[in-house]
Amino acid sequence: MKDIKQVIIAPDSFKGTMEAAQVCRIIQASVRNYFPAAAVRCIPMADGGEGMVDAYLELLGGRKVFLTVQGLQGRPVACHYGILPDGTAVMEMAACAGLPLLDGALDPMHTTTYGVGEMLLHAERNGIRRVLLGIGGSATVDCGLGMAAALGYRFLDKNGAQVEAVTCHMADIASIIVPDRKPKLDIIAACDVDTPLCGETGAIYTFGKQKGISEEMMPQMDAQMKRFARIIAKQTGVNVLDVPGAGAAGGMGAALLAFLNAKLKPGVELLLDAVGFDGLLKETDIVFTGEGRIDWQSIRGKVPVGVARRAQAAGVPCIALCGSVGEGAEQVFQKGVTAIFSAIGEACDFSQVKKNCIRDLKLLSDSVMRLLAAGSVQTLQAGVPLVLDKKYANGDFRGRWTKQTGLEHAQTAGISALDREITTERKEAR
């Protein structure tokens, strides 16, 4: 077995339970317990959602600026953004328009992104000229109406009367009044997904449910968003309908493109480039990444796949540790993930998940290191994907190996280095 001498740990936060830096520390402790001679580099990641400001400040240095802006429901909310040593401001849309701020009281028709515009204006007034704005983790589907209103844009109905800049009035908009002066900011939007604005893979159908939109409402809302996009194109000359990332944050990507001439880029790629990740991989033996849930959405711009692609290109195995796995998780194997290990093995509500998250990740991380110490790193280096689901209810682990040519389960075997028995079933590839 090749010794593990150089390790990179680069996870995203586990949404609602652990920040990325905490995840790093837990995995790092396990690595040090089982591979004490290994050099470990921790890179807390973010893809444009919660934790992005902290990730950049921890990795690159800088300071925080605190302010109060209008929140999702019109009430003041305290938030902050970061300023890097080169003067770039790093912001999170989620700081003033994120899902956690609603505490479960979803209201997609009336929530606003006005506070995002106020943050941008605050930065400009304080001499900032370059902004990196993360637009993940939002609670809104207003296509950036609120943000635009804060910047001086006005929206009129067919009679020329001003329309309130909230989602429930989007269908009434007939024209847009562009302000005489726009903020003089060079904005890069860090997107956590590459979702287009409309259609079956667009903002409403993909993320509407988690923001409180019923399936019955989706066709109507998708249609009104498409109609608004045509108005944008007519009055600004910017066609946002087919741009990857335009549907991020309920259409905020489209608004940033059209109203502020922003550039849309994958958030994970921006951070990996900022820390020189490709160079760090040259002497690395294995990479650990992860996020709260790995499923079909993970291939659309999330941290584990972004990290895994780079690792695969460098010939380095990449293991993903997550809270849970969902439908389509196997798709990440085609993007460079070598193995997935899931911490949640029994049905429970989120309060229990939150209560036990540190314990569960510690146990999972220790088990992964024991597996590697037992010799399985050779298999991982060979590029054979593995899914390992932890089942606390019955105390065993069930792993399955998958190949592009079919499904082949590993032979049943006991590995003495594990606290629990690892059982696998063999099935000939079809």
Task: List the predicted regions and their residue ranges.
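Cationic, low-complexity basic patches in intrinsically disordered or flexible, solvent-exposed regions
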Residues: 404, 409
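Short hydrophobic alpha-helical segments enriched in small aliphatic residues
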Residues: 393-395, 410
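N-terminal loops that bind phosphate or other acidic moieties
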Residues: 2-135, 139-392, 399-401
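Short linear motifs in low-complexity or flexible loops
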Residues: 412-417, 423-424
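Short, Lys/Arg-enriched N-terminal segments with co-localized hydrophobic residues
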Residues: 426-428
